Amino acid sequence: MEAAPLRELFIMAVGIGGEAGEVQELLKKHVRDGLEIHDDLLLELGDVLHYLTRIATQFGFTLDQVMGANCEKIEARHAKRVARMEKAHA
């Protein structure tokens, strides 16, 4: 990867981390202080989605592909968990 795309990728990675931190802060204040966060949370989640979309696009993925792969991973994890539970109770 060339220097310019690498620099942009780094900025996007740091950006998504920062925005995820903003989401965490809002949720903390909501749980701890009862703060109403609905509108602010919508905006911060949009920022996370913005960076996620840019990273996915840089690697040639669509958001549908990302979600599909994630659903498959979660389903496989759930199936393994169920199999372990069934084995433990057999």
Model segments located where?
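Flexible "arm" and connector segments at domain edges
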Residues: 1-90
